[in-house]
A protein has these predicted regions:
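Bacterial Sec-dependent N-terminal signal peptides
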Residues: 1-28
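Membrane-proximal, proline-rich intrinsically disordered regions
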Residues: 19-63
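A structural signal for short, hydrophobic/glycine-enriched beta-strand patches
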Residues: 39, 66-91, 170
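Inward-facing hydrophobic residues that define packing positions of alpha-helical scaffold repeats
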Residues: 45, 108-111, 185, 192
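Secretory-pathway/luminal and periplasmic proteins that interact with or process carbohydrate-rich
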Residues: 53-58, 72-75, 142-153
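Conserved, well-structured interaction surfaces
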Residues: 80-150, 177-183
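Short coil/linker segments at helix-helix boundaries
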Residues: 149-186, 190
């Protein structure tokens, strides 16, 4: 009986101390270093690709919306039908655009987290430069897609000076300022050169 009590006490003590890190709860938005191995960089990049295939991005809206807006095909879906008719302020079209904006910048924020950690670990892992380059190219790509939808057409007069979208380069939940078309394009090209 005495050995059962000792055995149970040892098991309980091991379980209570072994879960310490697992049970830690971090406030939402707190930056956590989840990149302790090269595989974790790959997992984070796979996570971003998975985000990009969501229905608000390349899984649906980001593919269909430009086609409908350019009237390459018609649809009976009320959100897309309104956009095809040039109605940009109705509730259906506005919610679609908000969903794209939110999910795109959420993906960009996750990409920025990878970029910041990859820059710190540039000489730590065999493929650190590859992870950094891939993340920078993804950041440029997603910003370019957002610019295409929410920025002025490039052929419009003074389009290069018009305020368009924020170009977010830091992992943060703060609101970033809107930049001109030229500044966004310059940032895209800079990220692509670095990649």
């Amino acid at each position: 009986m005495k050995s059962k009590i000792i055995f149970t006490t040892i098991i309980a003590a091991a379980l209570a101390t072994g879960c310490d890190k697992f049970l830690d709860v971090h406030p939402k938005g707190e930056k956590i270093n989840m990149f302790e191995t090269a595989e974790e960089y790959e997992d984070a990049l796979y996570g971003v690709y998975s985000e990009l295939t969501g229905s608000n991005l390349y899984g649906q809206h980001l593919i269909i919306l430009p086609e409908v807006m350019s009237q390459n095909f018609t649809t009976s879906d009320y959100k897309y039908a309104e956009l095809a008719e040039g109605e940009m302020t109705s509730s259906g079209s506005t919610s679609t655009k908000k969903e794209i904006w939110k999910d795109a910048y959420e993906a960009i924020n996750h990409i920025n987290n990878i970029v910041e950690h990859a820059e710190d670990d540039i000489d730590t892992y065999k493929h650190s430069r590859l992870y950094l380059g891939e993340a920078l190219a993804l950041r440029a790509f997603v910003h370019y897609e957002v610019l295409k939808l929410f920025g002025p057409p490039y052929w419009a007069s003074d389009s290069e000076k018009k305020t368009t979208i924020p170009y977010v380069t830091k992992y943060s939940f703060d609101i970033s300022p809107l930049l001109s078309y030229d500044e966004v394009c310059r940032n895209i090209l800079e990220d692509l050169k670095r990649a």
